[in-house]
């Protein structure tokens, strides 16, 4: 008699995805982040669901409802901070997951990679809308500034912005629809994750060497289930440390001031995980140019399969490309820092140089270094 997990239509899918899945024997801890992202998504949906039970998406009561959650709801404070800081952990894992893909050439699996890029956009849109919901000063002005960027689109821009706002400014209609979309999007993300995994299981996993590993596969369970559980334990511990010791470390103090359309904060900035794109946006004096650069800073990932000029897949044995990759990482961190600084000298020029370097490295220098390495190896 065959095992039920191998014969039952539903269990068979789970078995082929998590238990009997053939996995390369050499994949390192950099491959943990996919499963971690799944865990974070589940945590975000659960905490978000319980928060939504007590939240009201009305401009007059939104701020008070968040206060009520923190003060009056049993363990409401921990739900709120798990959700807010869980988003930060989500993005840390997301950036590391993308970085791993860039370093080890995972973008060669085009379908999986492109669904991943769509997922990144969807998660960023969800996080942005979630940041508006507490209806603090930074929520209101962040929403105003970022949505207003769409007015840079020629001809339809102004109409588009007013259509998104549901009026002539960010107001009750905007908050209500942002709450509706913020609730809906995680389920769309979950569906996209299934598509992402579907394409991923068509090709199998890449490995650090970038060499096909069909001849050296091991079952996912117990080897990688245990390994993923360790990664999850470490990250959940980090999240709990953040939530229980310094829950407001990554937030903005201005968001504890109720939204006031008549009083602009001295320095409007989004959450830390958008700062790199925000810095690129600010570094271009032209509004439309800034918006295009903002979108391209993430959309550039979709070009990675086209920009791959090396005869090797992974960067493991390519020291020149490694230097370029770590320059991109350093540049990303520099942009994140600049995005949080006021618009004044010397931050303006640093931001502009870092933005130019970001596109130059990815579009020109990395493909060039790959060609140089090919020549050095006489390929």
UniProtKB/Swiss-Prot annotation:
A ubiquinone binds at residue 201. Binds 2 heme b groups non-covalently. The chain crosses the membrane at residues 33-53, 77-98, 113-133, 178-198, 226-246, 288-308, 320-340, 347-367. GO terms for biological process: mitochondrial electron transport, ubiquinol to cytochrome c. Its cofactor is heme b. CDD domains: cytochrome_b_C, Cytochrome_b_N. Its main location: mitochondrion. It is found in: Mitochondrion inner membrane. GO terms for cellular component: mitochondrial inner membrane; respiratory chain complex III. GO terms for molecular function: metal ion binding; ubiquinol-cytochrome-c reductase activity. InterPro entries: Cyt_b/b6_C, Cyt_b/b6_C_sf, Cyt_b/b6_N, Cytb/b6-like_sf, Cytochrome_b, Cytochrome_b_C_euk/bac, Cytochrome_b_N_euk/bac, Di-haem_cyt_TM. Pfam families: Cytochrom_B_C (PF00032), Cytochrome_B (PF00033). Heme b b566 binds at residues 97, 196. It is a multi-pass membrane protein. PROSITE patterns: CYTB_CTER, CYTB_NTER. Heme b b562 binds at residues 83, 182. Component of the ubiquinol-cytochrome c reductase complex (complex III or cytochrome b-c1 complex) that is part of the mitochondrial respiratory chain. The b-c1 complex mediates electron transfer from ubiquinol to cytochrome c. Contributes to the generation of a proton gradient across the mitochondrial membrane that is then used for ATP synthesis. The cytochrome bc1 complex contains 11 subunits: 3 respiratory subunits (MT-CYB, CYC1 and UQCRFS1), 2 core proteins (UQCRC1 and UQCRC2) and 6 low-molecular weight proteins (UQCRH/QCR6, UQCRB/QCR7, UQCRQ/QCR8, UQCR10/QCR9, UQCR11/QCR10 and a cleavage product of UQCRFS1). This cytochrome bc1 complex then forms a dimer. Belongs to the cytochrome b family. This is Cytochrome b. It comes from Pteropus hypomelanus (Island flying fox). The lineage of its organism: Eukaryota, Metazoa, Chordata, Craniata, Vertebrata. The gene is MT-CYB.
